[in-house]
């Protein structure tokens, strides 16, 4: 489980980002990918905020699989958009906002099911990793952050094209 909080920086463009020391280096790299995607989708610059990202329980996030979750948490913290609490997500986030495949998807799905989650958002390229109806989960394979956001958020945090 990952959470984030954001406050306007005291000086625009001089915000800071803090992530648990126990988070793996690849998870920390996901924060910088998320910054690019956040700006493209919402128009918000992460550097205008002081952001604290926390892996609850101080867990080590090994690898890039939390990238989409990190993006969702930062987006929620900066925009105020509410994340659905009945959805789990996995997937690496690219600079272009593509949801890239990750390892251990079946195990993550099983863990989500054990935690009472009913909806799981996974990379499209991992679609065949979980046999249909095996875990009783509503599985949504996605290719982009926009597709993931439509499932993760109660209301879209994406800026309108007209803005």
Predicted region positions:
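Peripheral, non-AAA+ core regions of ATP-driven protein-machinery
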Residues: 2-163
């Amino acid at each position: 489980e990952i959470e984030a909080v954001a406050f306007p920086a005291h000086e625009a463009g001089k915000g800071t980002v803090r992530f648990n020391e126990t988070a793996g280096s690849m998870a920390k790299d996901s924060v910088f990918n998320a910054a690019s995607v956040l700006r493209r989708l919402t128009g918000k610059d992460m550097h205008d905020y002081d952001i604290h990202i926390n892996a609850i329980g101080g867990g080590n996030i090994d690898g890039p699989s939390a990238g989409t979750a990190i993006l969702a948490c930062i987006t929620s913290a900066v925009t105020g958009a509410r994340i659905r609490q009945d959805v789990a997500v996995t997937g690496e986030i690219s600079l272009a906002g593509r949801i890239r495949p990750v390892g251990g998807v079946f195990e993550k799905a099983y863990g989500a099911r054990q935690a009472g989650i009913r909806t799981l958002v996974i990379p499209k390229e991992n679609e065949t990793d979980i046999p249909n109806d095996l875990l009783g989960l509503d599985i949504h394979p996605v290719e982009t952050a926009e597709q993931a956001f439509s499932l993760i958020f109660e209301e879209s945090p994406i800026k309108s094209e007209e803005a």
